[in-house]
């Protein structure tokens, strides 16, 4: 039996000056671009990692301190996103997050010492975590069809595809990894302008929100943390995001350093991974309608296992990475889309804010663990380790389906 959620009146934040209805597509465009930026910021690191290793004389184990440094920012976002949004509003929270992320990426490029990059990782984690949680809550609160959340996460896939493609192309043109980060910072900075425009013009779809008062936001967060299905969803998505991040961070190193594939070919093969990912996100609405959400995740996990086995045992072929990207694409957004069916309505913002930010922990914890193991066992152990993660996701997903959905 699920515990009863806290009750209480909610308060709506509205502009004191009535304005004409604003086009909904503007807010959706901002949301989509926000996910492109976090996709680029996260995925570009994989191609730049060997250059960073060389610059600071690091090993696959010691470079993982960069991943670890992001954890504190992700944790802070996990426990504060719903409270910040209820106090400041969605748009101001996104502005803070965009400034934070831009600052972190630019500082990566400026860092003259390894400890500076490690320290700034906290800001990067905080910025990504707040953007992720805020945009997911905004979209899920307004959408009634799977296609919206699928399209949102497809744009993350576009960013994840662009990150390695941009980094590889700029490196081939003679830029160094620091200059690549300056380009990425410029791309992220455009989000600051978009969100600032929303605040200045008081764009209603993002300024008008029904959120629990600060007291009830805290109560709903506490309730979410006591709900088993929220905790299990967070753990499931943590492993899922960790798997995505491990592929993004380490696949290029496996392809180029371990398997001696030319740098340009290896870089674009990672872009192929994210092309498959993006196609999967774009097809999400159709797949959910035809298969149902639970069956879709089951099929995705099976396909993911097949792709990882082929990447491990058949290193010379080109189909495994796009297949892996396509397979993993539906898992995260489908799980988020199911959340309103699994928890009471009042708890949805806190639950989504918690699980998305906790999931972001996986982007630091799991690639870090894989790096330390690979430093001892060799880079070719990475495909096997990621396969074990896929098996773990299958076990967790079975636990989620046994929890069921709300019957009210």
PLM features per residue range, with description:
Residues 45-46, 227-271, 278-279:
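Extracytoplasmic gate region of multi-pass secondary transporters
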Residues 57, 89, 110-112, 260, ...:
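Helix-breaking motifs and short loop linkers at transmembrane-helix boundaries and internal kinks
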Residues 76-115:
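Conserved MFS/SLC helix-loop-helix module at the cytosolic interface between two early adjacent transmembrane helices
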Residues 120-155:
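Cytoplasmic helix-loop-helix junction between adjacent transmembrane helices
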Residues 130-143, 330-344:
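Intracellular juxtamembrane helix-capping segments at the cytosolic ends
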Residues 151-203:
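Helix-loop-helix hairpin linking two adjacent transmembrane segments in secondary transporters
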Residues 291-338:
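C-terminal transmembrane helical hairpin of 12-TM major facilitator-type secondary transporters
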Residues 345-379, 386:
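A late C-terminal transmembrane helix in Major Facilitator Superfamily
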């Amino acid at each position: 039996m699920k515990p009863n959620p806290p009750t209480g009146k909610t308060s709506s934040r509205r502009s004191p000056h009535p304005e004409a209805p604003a086009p909904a597509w503007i807010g959706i465009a901002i949301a989509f671009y926000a996910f492109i930026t976090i996709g680029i910021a996260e995925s570009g690191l994989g191609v730049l990692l060997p250059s960073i290793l060389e610059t600071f004389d690091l090993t696959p184990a010691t470079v993982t301190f960069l991943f670890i440094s992001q954890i504190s920012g992700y944790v802070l976002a996990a426990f504060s996103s719903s409270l910040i949004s209820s106090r400041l509003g969605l748009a101001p929270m996104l502005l803070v997050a965009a400034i934070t992320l831009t600052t972190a990426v630019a500082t990566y490029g400026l860092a003259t010492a390894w400890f500076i990059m490690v320290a700034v990782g906290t800001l990067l984690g905080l910025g990504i975590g707040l953007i992720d949680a805020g945009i997911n809550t905004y979209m899920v609160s307004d959408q009634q069809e799977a296609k919206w959340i699928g399209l949102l996460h497809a744009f993350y896939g576009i960013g994840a595809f662009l990150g390695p493609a941009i980094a590889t192309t700029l490196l081939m043109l003679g830029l160094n990894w620091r200059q690549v980060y300056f380009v990425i910072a410029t791309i992220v900075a455009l989000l600051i302008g978009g969100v600032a425009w929303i605040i200045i013009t008081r764009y209603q779809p993002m300024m008008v929100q029904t959120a629990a008062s600060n007291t009830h936001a805290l109560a709903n967060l506490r309730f979410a943390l006591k709900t088993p299905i929220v905790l299990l969803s967070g753990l499931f998505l943590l492993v899922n995001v960790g798997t995505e991040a491990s592929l993004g961070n380490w696949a290029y190193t496996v392809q180029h350093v371990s398997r001696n594939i030319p740098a340009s070919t290896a870089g674009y093969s990672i872009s192929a991974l994210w092309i498959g990912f993006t196609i999967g996100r774009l097809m999400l609405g159709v797949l959910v309608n035809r298969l149902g959400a639970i069956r879709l995740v089951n099929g995705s996990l099976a396909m993911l296992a097949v792709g990882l086995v082929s990447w491990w045992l058949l290193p010379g072929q080109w189909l495994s990475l796009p297949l892996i990207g396509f397979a993993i694409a539906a898992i995260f957004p489908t799980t988020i889309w199911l959340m309103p069916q699994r928890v009471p309505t009042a708890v949805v913002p806190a639950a989504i804010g918690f699980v998305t930010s906790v999931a972001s922990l996986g982007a630091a914890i799991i690639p870090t663990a894989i790096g330390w193991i690979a430093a001892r066992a060799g880079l070719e152990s990475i495909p096997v380790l990621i396969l074990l993660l896929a098996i773990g996701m299958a076990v967790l997903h079975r636990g989620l389906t046994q929890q069921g959905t709300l019957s009210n």
